[in-house]
Amino acid sequence: MSGVRLNKYIASSGLCSRRKADELIEQGVVAVNGKVVKELGYLVQTKDKVFVNKKLIHPAKHLYYKFYKPAGYITTCEDEKGRKTIYDILPESLNNLKPVGRLDKDSTGLLILTNDGDLINELTHPSVKVPKIYIVTVNSAVHRKDLEQMANGVEIEPNKIAYADIQVLEIDNKHTEMQITLYQGMNRQIRKMFEYFGYEVKVLKRVQHATIRLDGLKRGDVKPLKPA
């Protein structure tokens, strides 16, 4: 019998990744034509109606955008503290898209936005070493031994070792500008690594995520991407 696997159908709606869809199915919150389905291999047919938490879902056309996040905005849909979010400046038509990863409030640069749950999972799962490239400026000259230690690993939190590939672009007594490549996804990783050695990050801009580059965008700009 032909059809689409239930987890793929749910993921194609933009609700979540296939992995998360499997969890929802196992939790018993997914129903097809009014009946709860817990079979992970269930095949959805053309005329079937699928509900998650009693809400009807539909497969959505996958959309992909790149966005130049300005400083001062957090990467979330809503904020309990009332801070500005990226959705305050994105076009309302893109409010259903989710960011691939995050940038903290004071950081700028590239965010990929999509409703493709599988892609989000693929690019953010800890087991996948996807390169993310940043231009970073700190408040003084960084010692060579500190750069070497960052390359070898720094324990920024208990049992959490952070690594970074660092290329120095400019250095003097008052600042160091670097290109930094990360393959991990730890919260505020770059800032914590430099704080560990007593440096203050003054500028942090992401310029590349996987193969997508920031090129051609000004702060606040958003541009559609063509699917691969």
Functional labels for PLM-detected ranges:
Residues 1-228:
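Basic, flexible Lys/Arg- and Gly-enriched helix-loop patches that mediate nucleic-acid binding at interfaces
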